[in-house]
Each structure stands twice: as C-alpha cells, then as structure tokens.
Amino acid sequence: MDPNCSCATGGSCTCTGSCKCKECKCTSCKKSCCSCCPMSCAKCAQGCICKGASEKCSCCA
C-alpha cells in the first residue's frame, strides 16, 4: 500500500487529477499515479493506467 494513498493495492482509487500517490498500483488510478510513464507524458494524463514501474506503458513511445 502506498503511504501517500488511502486505497489498497489493486483496489479502487478515489484520487484523480490531484493524485499524490508515488507507488500506487490501484487498477483505477490515473494521471500522476502512472509510475511507468515520465511526469510530462501527455497521453498518460488522458487516462493511461499503469500497474507497476517495471511495466512498459503502451501509451508512451
């Protein structure tokens, strides 16, 4: 569980555009929770969902 996030790993997340999660792996987490994408990834902000920093994100080149 991410100390900056109230949701359980793999669960539903209530954070959206103002997400402060750093290692959040919630299935519904979006935007800045996308740990496998760079912070400036425009496509990520459009709804990319990543489940781990080690995964390659399909939204990023």
UniProtKB/Swiss-Prot annotation:
The modification N-acetylmethionine is found at M1. It comes from the Eukaryota. GO terms for cellular component: cytoplasm; cytosol; nucleus. Keywords: Acetylation, Cadmium, Copper, Metal-binding, Metal-thiolate cluster, Phosphoprotein, Zinc. A divalent metal cation 5 binds at C34, C36, C37, C50. The keyword Cell inner membrane does not apply. One of its GO terms (molecular function) is metal ion binding. A divalent metal cation 7 binds at C50, C57, C59, C60. A divalent metal cation 1 binds at C5, C7, C21, C24. A divalent metal cation 2 binds at C7, C13, C15, C26. It holds the Pfam family Metallothio. The modification Phosphoserine is found at S58. A divalent metal cation 6 binds at C37, C41, C44, C60. Belongs to the metallothionein superfamily. Type 1 family. Metallothioneins have a high content of cysteine residues that bind various heavy metals; these proteins are transcriptionally regulated by both heavy metals and glucocorticoids. Class I metallothioneins contain 2 metal-binding domains: four divalent ions are chelated within cluster A of the alpha domain and are coordinated via cysteinyl thiolate bridges to 11 cysteine ligands. Cluster B, the corresponding region within the beta domain, can ligate three divalent ions to 9 cysteines. This is Metallothionein-1A.
